[in-house]
């Protein structure tokens, strides 16, 4: 029989878990620590840890409008919460009723693709960035009410074809649900290569 953690030990682990993953839900924390959601909420209150929505806003306080060059922020699918141009970016997409099939409440795949693709465009440090090629894989269906966290990483700024390779991995909680590799065309290549995509 597994020994229950003390309140102090649980709260320390809860704090570490939230610091590592500020987007984790109270439900996921309750499951992880095998306690009720109310216990998680009380622990958070005692530790002065805000609820998920406030944590997301806090992480997103950085002004990304000035950071993103390749498209207006309102054209990004999901909310960018972290970005370092030509290096990495993170966005969050809440799956709502308008994003799912009515019959089974599963998100339409083009929304997951759009989140990943727009993040791959946004992370490029250019005025113009277009997707030249993509290879994608849906790993499991995403359902109504789930929160998709997409993480983009620039792997190769100028590959042999003069393109930038961006890899995107999307998660629900800690579960991988989508992957994509995007070859991105950059505006600096346009002036160097003429009109060739």
From Swiss-Prot:
NCBIfam families: PRK04424.1. InterPro entries: HotDog_dom_sf, Thioestr_dom, Transcription_factor_FapR, WH-like_DNA-bd_sf, WH_DNA-bd_sf. The keyword Ion transport does not apply. One of its GO terms (molecular function) is DNA-binding transcription factor activity. The keyword Transferase does not apply. Belongs to the FapR family. It comes from Bacillus cereus (strain 03BB102). GO terms for biological process: fatty acid biosynthetic process; negative regulation of DNA-templated transcription; negative regulation of fatty acid biosynthetic process. It comes from the Bacteria. This is Transcription factor FapR. Keywords: DNA-binding, Fatty acid biosynthesis, Fatty acid metabolism, Lipid biosynthesis, Lipid metabolism, Repressor, Transcription, Transcription regulation. Disulfide bonds: none annotated. Transcriptional factor involved in regulation of membrane lipid biosynthesis by repressing genes involved in fatty acid and phospholipid metabolism. The gene is fapR.
